[in-house]
Amino acid sequence: MPFDRDKLEELRSLAQRDFDRAWKEGAKLVREPGLRDRYPRLKVETGEPHPLFETIQQLREAYLRAGFREVVNPVIIPEEEVYKQFGPEAAAVLDRCFYLAGLPRPDVGLGADKVEKLAEVLGREPSEDEVERLRETLHAYKKGEIDGDELTHEIAEALDTDDGTAVRILDEVFPELKRLKPEPLEPPLTLRSHMTAGWFITLSEILKREDPPLKLFSIDRCFRREQREDESHLMTYHSASCVVVSDDVTVDTGKAVAEAILRQFGFEDFEFVPDEKMSKYYVPGTQTEVYAYHPDLEDSIEDEELGPGWVEIATFGLYSPVALAEYGIDYPVMNLGIGVERLCMVLHGIDDVRSLAYVEYEPWEPSDLELARMIDYERKPATSFGERLVREVVRGLHEHADEEGPVEVELFRGEFGDREVVVHAVEEEKGEPLAGPAAFNRVYVLDGNLYAVPPEGDFGREIREEGVYSGVSFEEGLAARLAYEVEELLATGGGETTVSVRKVSRPSQVNLSLPRKLLRYVTKKGGEIEIKGPVFVTLRAEVR
């Protein structure tokens, strides 16, 4: 909220007479952070890219810097295109492809039994005109004149009813629609299983209007019907693929392009090994695996033959003239492909490719600071009056902590509207201090463990120095609960309330809230939650 203008004017006037005093007095106008907006719970949120799409963007920039132009390749590939590219091997290759299918448009009848059921759902007899309009609607749906996502609304219009009733009609009057089974599309269509399937189609069209040399790249999703998904296999993945079309393309072109792209990611040395797979769309002997060395990977990745820091990262080859001839392409073409997920895993130290596609596989390793931000008070005041009560009670409890019982100390007195609030700390036992030895314990997070330790002294020193303070403490938690209950009394007409704690064995006793995700994390990692101690504090409030 803005500063009080009258007080600002007073400070301005005072500064003309005594600047140093005015400067010090100005501190009183600065608002203290409340329980709800205090660091570390107060955080400036920032966005964070997904590592997969961050890698895609880095690859896009790498290709562009290397002089390549970005294009979009077809995702839906007719089956016949696979035969043109693979020849006799196509039948085996298609086994890994997903085929597209769709639900048939049935010829739905509207006999007497359907009309009778329709009347039950409508709660009235449909008119002859309504039945005829419904019949016409179903016929139009059969012919494809009405899309599936429009059918509910069209039925509602035909019968002069609402969409909710139309949904019931589809479900109860025409249950056969739920029993429809997908049927393969004709002609057969597949989802792109590798980027090459799209490159032949794209190049055949581009070369009708452009002359070589061409340097093109495309980064997009491919689909492969794996037997199962595991740590290294997904049914959908991203390929960062490029082609070079030129009269002078050779295998060395692939080597040079691989180096140009991968050096931008910190890879320093390269080995090129003939690939034993020998795909039929490549010229025999040109399909090549690219191994690259990265100095930062020496401790995490090791190739059996090349040693630490070496990893297989890409494949390239020259397209077969046999396949090119099927598309009327007269020029040599080099194709390089980089698996985006593979590169992302290498660069980010990811062990399970599924973590890039499914949230449930993402490793969750929150920092101590992130865990500290999760710790809060279960009950806390909602008003500035309640916040002030908390501050003064905490301050007074610190000042009078060592006073011995029997004793009763006033910690707060204030007015809220026409009501007065008075808070006392009470110790009835003779010779016992007003606050026990653990009354001022603060909660820290260290290496994923939660500890409550005193604010000073030898006990807990290492935790205080190396851990992250959560911003919550025992005495403030008790004061916050008391302030919450005082606000409840102010809203209901007054009365008395007491917050009293002796030995603490669980966080809720001092009004601390630990979310389930934090508890699950600490428990799963076998961590500790040591929030306990002899508090021995009693706070009493009266609203009158």
Curated annotation (Swiss-Prot):
Source species, domain of life: Archaea
Any one GO molecular function term: tRNA binding
Catalysed conversion reaction: tRNA(Cys) + O-phospho-L-serine + ATP = O-phospho-L-seryl-tRNA(Cys) + AMP + diphosphate
E.C. number: 6.1.1.27
Annotated positions binding substrate: H194, M195, T196, S239, A240, S241, Y281, Y282, N335
UniProt keywords, alphabetically: Aminoacyl-tRNA synthetase, ATP-binding, Ligase, Nucleotide-binding, Protein biosynthesis
Keyword tRNA-binding recorded: no
GO BP of this protein: translation; tRNA aminoacylation
Signal peptide: none
Enzyme kind, highest EC tier: ligase
Summary of the function given for this chain in its UniProt record: Catalyzes the attachment of O-phosphoserine (Sep) to tRNA(Cys).
Subunit organization: Homotetramer. Interacts with SepCysS.
Family: Belongs to the class-II aminoacyl-tRNA synthetase family. O-phosphoseryl-tRNA(Cys) synthetase subfamily.
NCBIfam families: sepS
Identification of the protein by name: O-phosphoserine--tRNA(Cys) ligase
Species whose genome carries this gene: Methanopyrus kandleri (strain AV19 / DSM 6324 / JCM 9639 / NBRC 100938)
Gene name, Swiss-Prot/TrEMBL: sepS
